[in-house]
């Protein structure tokens, strides 16, 4: 079940992309930030409020198979690039896929420290870069 919200001249569809994307036609590019794996969700905390780790994420995590389905839906909707910030374990599932182009990293300018203080905090987010193959690859006007 999806919900449509209008924001000015934009339409935001709140729903499962595996159900919604096939109804929208094709796009030049899909940029997405799907939910991460269960371990990431379980460990995600904020120190706002009481000064100690409070659960931060209130939506469901994706299994590896769920992530595969989400990326398949994104690739099906894209005539070219699919760029996803994702759990590194999910990204690794695509390393040998024909659509795989590259892994990137978004380096956090001010990452949250590890609340447990028993290891370093995560300083980056994995960026999975795929291409549907429906048109030739071109990035940054050929650069």
Could you say what each language-model-derived stretch is?
Residues 5-143:
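Core catalytic lobe of class I
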Residues 1-2:
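Short, acidic/polar N-cap/turn motifs at the starts of alpha helices
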């Amino acid at each position: 079940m999806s919900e449509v919200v209008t924001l000015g001249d934009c339409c935001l569809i709140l729903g499962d992309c595996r159900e919604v994307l096939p109804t929208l036609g094709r796009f030049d590019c899909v940029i997405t930030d799907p939910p991460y794996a269960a371990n990431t969700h379980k460990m995600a905390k904020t120190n706002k409020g009481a000064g100690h780790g409070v659960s931060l994420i209130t939506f469901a995590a994706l299994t590896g198979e769920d992530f595969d389905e989400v990326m398949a839906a994104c690739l099906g909707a894209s005539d070219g690039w699919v760029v996803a910030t994702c759990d590194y374990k999910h990204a690794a599932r695509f390393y040998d896929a024909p659509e795989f182009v590259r892994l990137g990293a978004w380096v956090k300018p001010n990452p949250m420290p590890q609340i447990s203080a028993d290891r370093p905090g995560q300083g980056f987010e994995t960026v999975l870069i795929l291409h549907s193959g429906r048109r030739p690859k071109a990035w940054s006007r050929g650069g």
